[in-house]
Amino acid sequence: MNLIVCVEDQMGMMFNRRRQSQDRILRQRMLEMIGQEKLYVSPYTAKQFEQQEKLVILDNPQSLRGNLWCFIEDPQHLPPEDQISRIVVYRWNRAYPSDRYFSIDLNLWELTSFQEFAGYSHEKITEEVYLNETIMD
């Protein structure tokens, strides 16, 4: 699986069962990155996308298998780490209140790409791509 997540400075993903932030340029970049592939999301996550023709909405995205793209906002829905071959981390470069955190230790993964870009509502968003070469689908 190709996992996409957004985190704040302390790896927080949610607060009080809500996403911490969102950004329209980040969403556009995400859809461009996956090309013609579908993006698997929860019903909650789907609400932030205007163009939903590339989305597949699932209640249980962590059950996915194979070389699929999945954007997960709630860390309680993260798949087992041994099913993930790529992680794309978008960093807000801000501190937000958090009570749910990204739990995968990225130090055990290979950082293969690092880019910064200006978002619509964020001056700087960092995109990091990590690979687990032992699990390439």
Model region roles, listed by residue range:
Residues M1-D137:
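Enzymes that bind and transform nitrogen-containing heteroaromatic metabolites
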